[in-house]
Structures are given as structure tokens and as C-alpha cells.
């Protein structure tokens, strides 16, 4: 090599210049880029990428133009390798390049020797050695043809090689982990982070449960499915779940107790379950010699006792949580504690009914709740608990002569508490309600909600709606009559959805204007001009065959076929009156039928049947009022009341009408006052009937006002409207408030009546003429 020659030494294979990757573009270079054919390119491109024309190489470097190149053979380069010490920076760049070309896993498996000899060794081996590999056994697909090569294909091939290398390295896990640690530390420039283990690492417990856990898991699943309908089936499964030791027994009882106290409505069912299990499970030996045997009953009572006695301590702990940031947590825990306490009280009462708890324990609980000192007012939570306790077991205790005498002592104390000003007004009303309940033979004013089977629910629905027995079962099966099935699905009024969700003719059903009518055999009757304004298909005179109104009404409420057969009343078919024959038409659009005269059968007058019972009258009253509240048609309501056919029942009707209207949410004061005015003007209801009905309702207002605080005010408004109508006067108001004991309710009734009367010009003169009676009302 001469000094004068301006040559550039290059260590690149082929003596390339500048920033050329594979060689120069000179034609004299044996390994230059221009001298390679397209078939040779894949040997220098392991990934089988695009042809050379697609690579954005620069044509050359102007700094070395016109200078002679020095070419080195493979042997010369290998000699240079043995005597040359590469810096760490160059080695790092080589590793990164190899990782890009062959994948990281391939780099980790090959080691540094492969990286350092990457280009020369690979090219030499591919040129000198024949390809004897078994290409058919390859797991990955061969690279696509030149037309199909793309970056997506390259990425997929790289990913497949990465997965293959990972599977290979997993066979030697320690070496693989070691090599990964080295590579990551070298690439990142520092030691790999230490793996932090969790204190309680996750572990798959499925299939590794102990016998106790398996039984408790089974019992918990059974309790979650337990309902009155499935009680017998699931009770047997629970008994046979594998309760074979005392520890399992205690766990099962704890699950039942926790479930019962959080679901007080189902406490009767859980108490019965405890009684049945206690009778069928065996006893277990004690943990220590000399102790009593472990039985279901003993363990259950111990759990109930611990929960009852520990409630006070838990309340004290909650009172100490006074920090502002603990307020939300304290409120949640107080609600949960109250729910569990009342649920425990309810469960103990139901266990008494099943004879699982002796009466002496019940008396001990009552005495603990009331306290030993009669001059000290018990805690509010204790007063509420004692009310719930007597509501559950009061009738049971009064059934025993000895317990009844003790009950008298308890209720004297409760009588004093009902007037104790230290007690919250809500709790005083609650205590008074229990006292009234006892005086009424332990019959609650309102039916208590309890768990029922589906059959019981259907029976009650049939009773309330006046359906024949078994009708709701047919509805569920999609049957509208005993003779023919219909397509499955809900039964809609008029055979279409969106009409209130009730059956045709049921109280509350109202057809929209313009809807075609439907008769009782589910024939659709197109609306014509001759139909009634009230959307009821009246007598029609159309060129069609008429059919009588003797239709299938067995599944409709008693008296509800009026809407379907042209009658507008909900009581026409069940009140004993003679039904009028009505004809409806079924037009056939495809045929033209000449007018026909069909004789209408005339029913013979039947002798009036026996008088309806009070229960039937109340049911019919409720039905017609519900229908009136929905459709607000005074004429229909008038016809319904007339068809009751019992004027002596009219005072009771007035009372029921007021009661039902004020129990609505919101109360329907204006509609019921309008109805009573209308009945009075039509002389269907006499003024004496109104007075008696008002007095009957006023006598109950003290009790009603506890549950409906606005009832006295709303009742006063109804009375005021009837005073303006001339049906009653303020002398009646004086009699009404004379039957009331609560002075606050008395004032609300008088003020509301006066306010309504003085709102009109006519009322001002009435107030002046009855000023003495008004003053007497205010002085009561």
C-alpha cells in the first residue's frame, strides 16, 4: 500500500464506502450492490425482504469519489478479528442489529459469538454448504412470493420465530432465565429489578377445598336458592349435604342465622327450616369430656344470645367513631347493626312459635329491653325492638294464662312510654300501634308482608280481581279459555301491547280513542260512526251478521264484561241484575252481505238472588272505584253504585271511597269529591249517607294519620267541597272532630275545610252563617 495513494480503508465486506450497507455500486466490485442478482439478495437479507430497488440507499459519498478502494478477502478479515479489540459501544450496536435481523430470542440463544460473526459466517455457510434442511417439517410457512411480501408478512414471520424460540428456551428454564437476565441487564445498562413477591400470593383453590369448606359452600348455595316454593326440595338437600361433625354444624348454623337476620321477611321460613333440621340431624359429642352434647338447637340459641348481648357493645364502639372522616362508615355500620338486631329479634320470635325457644328466654329479652327502672326511658333502639318483638310473639304469649298476666305488666309500661315526652314521636306512635293491636285481638290494621308461594299469590289475585279459581294459571300458560290455546306471550288488552298491561275488561283498562273494539271472543270489531263516544261498541246496525252478547267471560273479573260487551260498568255481570242483550258486529271486508234481521233473544226476568255479603260488596266497591280513578267517567260510576242495589250500604261506600282515594299516591282528592257531589246531585246517595260515611272515616283518622300524615288535611278538603255542594255543614265537622283524640289532626281537618269553603264567593256567606259552629270546632 503506497502512502501517496489516496485510498480509503474499509472494514465492510466488499470494501464498500460511505454509509453503504452491503457494498459499493462499482461494477468492478465482486460483492458490490450492482453486481448481485435478485436471486442473491435473500442470502444477504435474512428476512427475505423487498428487492434492492426498494431500499432507500444513497448512491455514494462525495468525499471518497475518485479514490481507489481496497478489497479484503474473508481470511484477511478473520485475521483482523483475532488482533482487533472491539469497544463495548460497537458490541452493543452489533447486538441491537442482530436483534432486529434475527429476533431477540434468537440472539439470546446464539450468544455473543454468533453476533460478532453474524455477516461473514452466515454468508459463507450459505454459499459453501448445500442446503440439506428438511423444509417440510418446518412449523412456520415459507416466506411469500415477491408480489405478496409486505411488512405485515415480515411481522408475522418474526412473531412466529419468537414464539418458537420461547418454546425451545422453556425446556431449559434456569438457563433461559439466566440468559434473559444477562441480556436485559446488558441492554438496559443496569441490573434487572428484583421480583417482589406478594405477602398472600394467589393460588388456585378449586379442587383443593377441605371437607368443611365444601359442605359450607354447598349449604350457602342452597340457602341462596331457598324460597317457600322450593322449600321441601332444598330442605332435603341441605340435610343430606354432609353435616358430619360439630365444626360443620356450627358453620351451617352460622350461615342460616346470618341469612335470616338480614332477610326478616323470610324469618318464618328460616325458623321452620331450623325446626326441621333440628329434628333430623344427630347430636355430636362435646369437645371436652363432661360437657353437654352439641345439638343444633343449643348451638343456634347460643348464637342468638351472643348476637343479642353483643349489640350494646357494638353500639358503644360505634359511638366512639366521632371523627368527621368516619361519619359515613359509622352510618353504614349503624344501619347494618339495626337491621341485624331487629332481624335477630324477629328470628327469636319465630323460633318461639316453632317451640325452639322456651318462654323464659322471651321474658328475659323483654325485661332487658324495657330495663329494670320504670322511671328511666329505654333506649330508642330497644323501644323499636320491643315493638317488633310483640308484633311477632304477642298473640303467642297471650295464649297462655300465666304469660298473659305477665304481658299485662309489660303493656302497662308500654302505655306509659306512649305518653313519655322524652321518647321520639315516631316511637310513641309505634308503641301506641302495638297497644291498639293487642286490644284488637292482635289483628294488624294493615296486612303484614310475608313470604308466599306463587300459588298463594295467584289465589289472592283471583280473590281481589274476582276471577274464577285457576284463571291465573291459565293466563300464565297463555290460555284465554278452557277450550283453545293462543300463541305464547303476555295477554294484552285488545290483543295488542301498550294498553295498560291488563286483561280486557279488567278494572283500569281503557281503550284509546280510535282503537278497534274487541268482543269477549277476541273478535276485533272495527270502529264505526255508530259506536259510542266512550269507545265502547254499542248497538250497531251494519250489513253484517250480528251475534248476541252471551260470550265467554269466565276469565274476566266478576262484573268486568261490561266493557267488552257494550256495557260500561265493571259490575254489570256480577251484581245480580238482569243483563241487557247487546249485539256487536263482525264485518267481513271480503264479502258483501245483505242486511239481515236477526231476532234478539229476550231474557226472562229472574228473581232477585240473595243479598250480597259484605265481603263481596267491598270487593265490588273497590273494583268500581279503581275503574273510576282510571277512566274518570261519572256516568259509569253512577251506574255501578245503582247496581249495588243496597242503599243501606251507601254510608260504608262513602267511607271506603274516601279511604281508598286518600291511600293513593298521590291522593286523588278532587276526583272523589267530584264523584260524591255527582252522586248527591243524582240522589243516588243521600245527605244522611254522606254524614254517616264521614263519621265512620273520622273515627279511624287517629290511626290513619300515623301512616298517612296528610290524610287529615285531605279529608278536610273533601268535607269542605261537600259543604260547598250543600251536602253537609260545619255541625257535621264538629261531630267528626269530636270522635278524634289527636288535637293536631282535629285542627288540620277544620283548617282545611274552612280554607276550601272560603276560596269561593258562595263559601264566604256560608262561613258567616255558620260562624258559631266553626268557632265551636276551633274550641274543641
From Swiss-Prot:
GO molecular function, one term: translation initiation factor activity
Keyword Repressor tagged: no
Biological process according to GO: regulation of translation
Region Disordered: start-end pairs: 1-68, 125-154, 166-194, 529-549
Top-level taxon: Eukaryota
Domain MIF4G, first and last residues per copy: 216-440
Ranges of compositional bias, category Basic and acidic residues: 128-137
SMART domains with a match to the protein in the record: MA3, MIF4G
Compositional bias segments (type: Low complexity): 19-45
Domain MI residue range list: 616-738
Role according to the record: Plays a role in the accumulation of some potyvirus during viral infection.
Chain ranges passing through the membrane: none
Keyword match Protein biosynthesis: yes
Summary of subunit composition and partner proteins: EIF4F is a multi-subunit complex, the composition of which varies with external and internal environmental conditions. It is composed of at least EIF4A, EIF4E and EIF4G. In higher plants two isoforms of EIF4F have been identified, named isoform EIF4F and isoform EIF(iso)4F. Isoform EIF4F has subunits p220 and p26, whereas isoform EIF(iso)4F has subunits p82 and p28.
Signal peptide: none
Entries under InterPro entries matching the protein: ARM-type_fold, Initiation_fac_eIF4g_MI, MIF4G-like_typ-3
Any Pfam family the entry gives: MA3
Consequence of gene loss (knockout): Displays resistance to potyvirus (PPV or LMV) infection. I4g1/i4g2 double mutants show reduced germination rates, slow growth rates, moderate chlorosis, late flowering, impaired fertility and reduced long term seed viability. They also exhibit altered responses to dehydration, salinity, and heat stress. The i4g1 and i4g2 double mutant has reduced amounts of chlorophyll a and b.
GO cellular component labels: cytoplasm; nucleus; plastid
Species: Arabidopsis thaliana (Mouse-ear cress)
Family: Belongs to the eukaryotic initiation factor 4G family.
Biased composition (Polar residues): 166-186
Protein name: Eukaryotic translation initiation factor isoform 4G-1
Gene behind the chain: EIF(ISO)4G1
UniProt keyword annotations, A-Z: Initiation factor, Protein biosynthesis, Translation regulation
